[in-house]
Amino acid sequence: MIVRPQQHWLRRIFVWHGSVLSKISSRLLLNFLFSIAVIFMLPWYTHLGIKFTLAPFSILGVAIAIFLGFRNNAGYARYVEARKLWGQLMIASRSLLREVKTTLPDSASVREFARLQIAFAHCLRMTLRKQPQAEVLAHYLKTEDLQRVLASNSPANRILLIMGEWLAVQRRNGQLSDILFISLNDRLNDISAVLAGCERIAYTPIPFAYTLILHRTVYLFCIMLPFALVVDLHYMTPFISVLISYTFISLDCLAEELEDPFGTENNDLPLDAICNAIEIDLLQMNDEAEIPAKILPDRHYQLT
């Protein structure tokens, strides 16, 4: 995620980091070079009686813009829902530990439970990003718990099970009444709902056929556009063609990024920073001495 301060409008025009321009610059360069080639081809295809006009491109351009808008809205809706889910995880994690600490006597067991919560957040992050988990989770889980988690097809869900088992032990030992156990178990259900919601977004992409047809149409439009522009614009064709192509190609590229909000690209959610915030909050609630430093944006204003 790019977290930039407010900028002057003129300075913002030339921003590079965080813009999709860095990803599509090579495609725009090809469009520029192809437009130059079309200028030299103009006498040849005019001699053959081939004539392109802007009218069909105007109609097609409007249609593409509408469908790109729909796709970007769908991608942004996934992005917003994903952020809400992680916000719910932060709320549920704080509330669960607060209720445990105010109900049970402060002990090493309660601190262990807090580490299970931290492990869950990191495990969910790494699962969504398809990253290796063993090294990170080893800092928070006991050896036997770590082995159970890594052997599971759903590591985050296994950690939830271990948390549920911990609550059950406290209940059997008489530390929790039935009412308190049900209340705390409801918090675990809230966290489980977050897990299911994130999995729904991660494993249900926007239909491929819809993405493919829009992607093809955008690039065919950008390839054919110089033939229609060159008749009236001549040597200005490359510049106008690149400007129009930038609009369509950048929207297509941005939609691809928003479709998977859990990745590590510029416009994805800062899951590292969110997990870091959860860890800091839970450790401070337990009055731990060693607290990790807060993750801040880098020099390019990016949070991962």
Curated annotation (Swiss-Prot):
It holds the Pfam family Bestrophin. InterPro entries: Bestrophin-like (IPR021134), YneE/VCCN1/2-like (IPR044669). The keyword Ion transport applies. It is found in: Cell membrane. GO terms for biological process: bacterial-type flagellum-dependent swarming motility. It is a multi-pass membrane protein. One of its GO terms (molecular function) is chloride channel activity. It comes from the Bacteria. Keywords: Cell membrane, Ion transport, Membrane, Transmembrane, Transmembrane helix, Transport. GO terms for cellular component: plasma membrane. Its main location: membrane. The chain crosses the membrane at residues 28-48, 50-70, 194-214, 220-240. PANTHER family: UPF0187 PROTEIN YNEE, VOLTAGE-DEPENDENT ANION CHANNEL-FORMING PROTEIN YNEE. Belongs to the anion channel-forming bestrophin (TC 1.A.46) family. This is Voltage-dependent anion channel-forming protein YneE. It comes from Escherichia coli (strain K12). The lineage of its organism: Bacteria, Pseudomonadati, Pseudomonadota, Gammaproteobacteria, Enterobacterales.
